[in-house]
Curated annotation (Swiss-Prot):
Family classification: Belongs to the conotoxin I2 superfamily.
This protein's domain notes: The cysteine framework is XII (C-C-C-C-CC-C-C).
GO molecular function, one term: toxin activity
Modified residues (4-carboxyglutamate): 30, 34, 37, 40-41
PTM (free text): Contains 4 disulfide bonds.
Keywords for the protein's UniProt record, in alphabetical order: Disulfide bond, Gamma-carboxyglutamic acid, Secreted, Signal, Toxin
Official protein name in the record: Conotoxin Gla-MrII
Source species of the chain: Conus marmoreus
Amino acid sequence: MFGHTSVSFLLLSIVALGMVATVICSCDSEFSSEFCEQPEERICSCSTHVCCHLSSSKRDQCMTWNRCLSAQTGNRRSTHMQKRFLRMPRDLAD
């Protein structure tokens, strides 16, 4: 019985360490694989990441402030270009 308990504890420890290592590794990157529900709230597991709203078609994702600002600027630029294209005379748009 003692052997079974120690094996279970060992496996549980390995799983817990793996989860901690995953969070630590993802905190070093600008993007996290973590999705969130409250844009601009600090509810992400990494203290350096915030919940960022990318677009209506994508889920909000945890990332650094700088990456979030550049992603949102890119989305606005893309939308602006689409609107400008739609206003073009029809013969130029083809």
